Amino acid sequence: MRERNRSALHEKLCQILGSRNVYHDPPATIKMNYPCIVYKRDSVSPRKADNISFIKWYPYSVQVISKDPDFPLFDTFLDNFDYGSEGAPFVADNLHHSNFTIFT
C-alpha cells in the first residue's frame, strides 16, 4: 500500500512540475536538474480514538528547488493537495528552496 501511494505521489509531483526532475530521497552523488522537486517520507501520523488507530496520514517532506527566485510553483504548490503546510524558504548555493509538508 505504501509503495503504491509513493508511486502515485511521484507521478503527481512530475505532473505538477511538468518534468521528470522529481527525486525521492536522492543520494548526495546524484546530479539534479533544476527546477526540481525532492521529497522523502516522514514518520506516520496515526489518528486514534479509544487507543485504536482509525486513520493514518502519510506525511512527506517536499522541497521545490529552482534557480529562479520567482519560480511560480513556490506560490501554487499547495493548491495541488488537500492537506499540507509550508515551511520556511531558504537559499543555498544560489538555489531557492521552498519547503512543504504534504499528507497522503
Predicted feature locations:
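Short, solvent-exposed beta-strand/turn "edge" segments of beta-rich domains on protein surfaces
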Residues: 49-53, 91-92
